[in-house]
Design a protein with these regions (language model features):
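Charged, low-complexity intrinsically disordered regions
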Residues: 1-185
Length: 185
Protein backbone atom coordinates (compact mmCIF):
# COMPACT_ATOMS: atom_id res chain seq x y z
CA UNK A 1 0.00 0.00 0.00
CA UNK A 2 2.94 2.30 -0.08
CA UNK A 3 6.56 2.84 0.62
CA UNK A 4 7.73 1.93 4.12
CA UNK A 5 11.13 2.01 5.80
CA UNK A 6 10.12 0.77 9.24
CA UNK A 7 9.22 -2.90 9.66
CA UNK A 8 8.41 -4.73 12.89
CA UNK A 9 7.22 -8.28 13.43
CA UNK A 10 5.92 -10.18 16.46
CA UNK A 11 3.96 -13.31 17.36
CA UNK A 12 5.18 -15.46 14.45
CA UNK A 13 3.33 -18.75 13.88
CA UNK A 14 4.04 -21.55 11.44
CA UNK A 15 1.01 -23.87 11.07
CA UNK A 16 -0.69 -26.15 8.56
CA UNK A 17 -4.19 -25.79 7.15
CA UNK A 18 -5.87 -29.22 6.92
CA UNK A 19 -2.50 -30.70 7.86
CA UNK A 20 -1.09 -30.12 4.35
CA UNK A 21 -1.02 -26.42 3.39
CA UNK A 22 1.70 -24.44 5.18
CA UNK A 23 0.63 -21.10 6.63
CA UNK A 24 3.08 -18.59 8.03
CA UNK A 25 1.60 -15.68 9.94
CA UNK A 26 2.77 -12.87 12.16
CA UNK A 27 1.74 -9.57 13.60
CA UNK A 28 3.28 -6.94 11.32
CA UNK A 29 3.76 -3.19 11.62
CA UNK A 30 5.05 -1.23 8.63
CA UNK A 31 5.70 2.49 8.89
CA UNK A 32 7.08 5.28 6.78
CA UNK A 33 9.47 7.39 8.86
CA UNK A 34 10.42 10.75 7.37
CA UNK A 35 12.83 13.24 8.88
CA UNK A 36 13.01 16.83 7.73
CA UNK A 37 14.37 20.18 8.92
CA UNK A 38 12.27 23.26 9.29
CA UNK A 39 13.39 26.78 8.35
CA UNK A 40 14.99 27.22 11.80
CA UNK A 41 17.11 24.09 11.41
CA UNK A 42 15.09 21.96 13.85
CA UNK A 43 14.75 18.31 12.94
CA UNK A 44 11.24 16.81 12.87
CA UNK A 45 10.30 13.20 12.36
CA UNK A 46 6.94 12.11 11.02
CA UNK A 47 5.88 8.49 11.36
CA UNK A 48 3.00 7.19 9.25
CA UNK A 49 1.64 3.70 9.81
CA UNK A 50 1.17 1.89 6.51
CA UNK A 51 -0.09 -1.41 7.95
CA UNK A 52 -0.69 -2.76 11.44
CA UNK A 53 -2.18 -6.19 11.94
CA UNK A 54 -1.90 -9.84 10.99
CA UNK A 55 -0.27 -10.96 7.76
CA UNK A 56 -0.58 -14.58 6.63
CA UNK A 57 0.89 -16.47 3.68
CA UNK A 58 -0.52 -19.84 2.64
CA UNK A 59 1.14 -22.09 0.05
CA UNK A 60 -1.37 -24.17 -1.87
CA UNK A 61 -0.75 -27.25 -3.97
CA UNK A 62 -2.77 -26.08 -6.97
CA UNK A 63 -2.14 -22.90 -8.93
CA UNK A 64 -5.01 -20.77 -10.23
CA UNK A 65 -2.67 -19.43 -12.95
CA UNK A 66 -3.91 -15.90 -12.36
CA UNK A 67 -4.20 -13.20 -9.71
CA UNK A 68 -7.24 -12.27 -7.60
CA UNK A 69 -7.25 -9.34 -5.18
CA UNK A 70 -10.08 -8.62 -2.72
CA UNK A 71 -9.90 -5.26 -0.93
CA UNK A 72 -12.12 -2.82 0.91
CA UNK A 73 -14.76 -1.13 -1.23
CA UNK A 74 -13.50 1.99 -2.98
CA UNK A 75 -9.88 0.87 -3.31
CA UNK A 76 -10.17 -0.13 -6.97
CA UNK A 77 -12.89 2.35 -7.93
CA UNK A 78 -15.39 -0.53 -8.14
CA UNK A 79 -12.77 -3.07 -9.17
CA UNK A 80 -12.60 -4.61 -12.57
CA UNK A 81 -15.22 -7.27 -11.92
CA UNK A 82 -18.80 -6.98 -10.72
CA UNK A 83 -19.80 -9.78 -8.37
CA UNK A 84 -23.25 -11.39 -8.14
CA UNK A 85 -23.93 -9.93 -4.68
CA UNK A 86 -24.84 -6.29 -4.15
CA UNK A 87 -24.22 -6.78 -0.42
CA UNK A 88 -20.69 -8.02 -1.17
CA UNK A 89 -20.13 -5.01 -3.47
CA UNK A 90 -20.93 -2.69 -0.53
CA UNK A 91 -17.93 -4.04 1.39
CA UNK A 92 -15.41 -5.20 -1.20
CA UNK A 93 -13.86 -4.56 -4.59
CA UNK A 94 -12.36 -7.40 -6.61
CA UNK A 95 -9.57 -7.00 -9.12
CA UNK A 96 -8.46 -10.03 -11.13
CA UNK A 97 -6.64 -11.25 -14.19
CA UNK A 98 -9.20 -14.02 -14.95
CA UNK A 99 -12.87 -13.22 -14.38
CA UNK A 100 -14.10 -16.78 -14.98
CA UNK A 101 -11.86 -18.35 -12.34
CA UNK A 102 -12.62 -15.50 -9.93
CA UNK A 103 -16.37 -16.11 -10.25
CA UNK A 104 -15.83 -19.85 -9.71
CA UNK A 105 -13.81 -19.29 -6.53
CA UNK A 106 -15.82 -16.45 -5.00
CA UNK A 107 -19.08 -18.36 -4.65
CA UNK A 108 -22.09 -16.94 -2.81
CA UNK A 109 -21.02 -18.93 0.26
CA UNK A 110 -17.54 -17.38 0.18
CA UNK A 111 -18.91 -13.87 -0.38
CA UNK A 112 -21.38 -14.31 2.51
CA UNK A 113 -18.55 -15.61 4.68
CA UNK A 114 -16.38 -12.57 3.86
CA UNK A 115 -19.25 -10.17 4.62
CA UNK A 116 -19.98 -11.88 7.96
CA UNK A 117 -16.34 -11.89 9.02
CA UNK A 118 -15.99 -8.23 8.03
CA UNK A 119 -18.87 -7.44 10.39
CA UNK A 120 -17.55 -9.70 13.18
CA UNK A 121 -13.96 -8.45 13.00
CA UNK A 122 -14.97 -4.81 12.67
CA UNK A 123 -11.78 -4.24 10.68
CA UNK A 124 -10.87 -4.32 7.00
CA UNK A 125 -8.92 -7.16 5.44
CA UNK A 126 -7.36 -7.92 2.07
CA UNK A 127 -6.93 -11.23 0.29
CA UNK A 128 -4.52 -11.70 -2.60
CA UNK A 129 -4.18 -14.99 -4.45
CA UNK A 130 -1.31 -15.22 -6.92
CA UNK A 131 -1.01 -18.58 -8.66
CA UNK A 132 -0.57 -21.03 -5.74
CA UNK A 133 -0.01 -18.55 -2.89
CA UNK A 134 -2.69 -16.83 -0.81
CA UNK A 135 -1.90 -13.73 1.23
CA UNK A 136 -4.28 -12.40 3.87
CA UNK A 137 -3.89 -9.06 5.67
CA UNK A 138 -6.10 -8.26 8.64
CA UNK A 139 -5.97 -4.58 9.59
CA UNK A 140 -6.55 -5.31 13.30
CA UNK A 141 -3.63 -3.48 14.91
CA UNK A 142 -1.64 -5.01 17.74
CA UNK A 143 -3.06 -8.34 18.87
CA UNK A 144 -2.26 -11.50 20.82
CA UNK A 145 -1.13 -9.68 23.93
CA UNK A 146 -1.98 -10.65 27.51
CA UNK A 147 -5.69 -11.11 28.16
CA UNK A 148 -5.51 -10.55 31.92
CA UNK A 149 -6.93 -7.21 32.99
CA UNK A 150 -6.06 -5.12 36.05
CA UNK A 151 -8.40 -7.21 38.21
CA UNK A 152 -6.41 -10.36 37.33
CA UNK A 153 -9.36 -11.74 35.44
CA UNK A 154 -9.40 -12.97 31.88
CA UNK A 155 -10.64 -10.27 29.50
CA UNK A 156 -13.36 -12.23 27.71
CA UNK A 157 -13.84 -9.58 25.00
CA UNK A 158 -10.18 -9.72 24.03
CA UNK A 159 -10.16 -13.52 24.02
CA UNK A 160 -13.24 -13.50 21.76
CA UNK A 161 -11.58 -11.00 19.40
CA UNK A 162 -8.45 -13.16 19.17
CA UNK A 163 -10.59 -16.25 18.56
CA UNK A 164 -12.48 -14.46 15.75
CA UNK A 165 -9.18 -13.53 14.07
CA UNK A 166 -7.90 -17.12 14.16
CA UNK A 167 -11.31 -18.46 13.12
CA UNK A 168 -11.38 -16.11 10.12
CA UNK A 169 -7.91 -17.15 8.94
CA UNK A 170 -8.75 -20.83 9.34
CA UNK A 171 -12.26 -20.75 7.87
CA UNK A 172 -11.68 -18.54 4.84
CA UNK A 173 -8.41 -20.22 3.88
CA UNK A 174 -10.02 -23.68 4.07
CA UNK A 175 -13.00 -22.57 2.00
CA UNK A 176 -10.90 -20.89 -0.70
CA UNK A 177 -8.48 -23.83 -0.85
CA UNK A 178 -11.44 -26.22 -1.22
CA UNK A 179 -12.84 -24.13 -4.08
CA UNK A 180 -9.44 -23.94 -5.77
CA UNK A 181 -8.94 -27.71 -5.49
CA UNK A 182 -12.43 -28.33 -6.93
CA UNK A 183 -12.14 -25.85 -9.83
CA UNK A 184 -11.05 -26.95 -13.29
CA UNK A 185 -8.15 -24.68 -14.17
Amino acid sequence: DGYYNGYYSDDYADVYINGQYPMKMAEILTQRVETHRDSKGHTHTTTTTIFSGIFAKINMKKSINCQIRIKEDGVFYNGNINMDSTQFEKYFDVDCSDKVITMQLLTHDVMDMLINFRKILGAPFDILIVNNVMYIRLHVGKVFESVINKYLAVDVGTVKRYYNIIDFLDTISKELIKNIENTEI
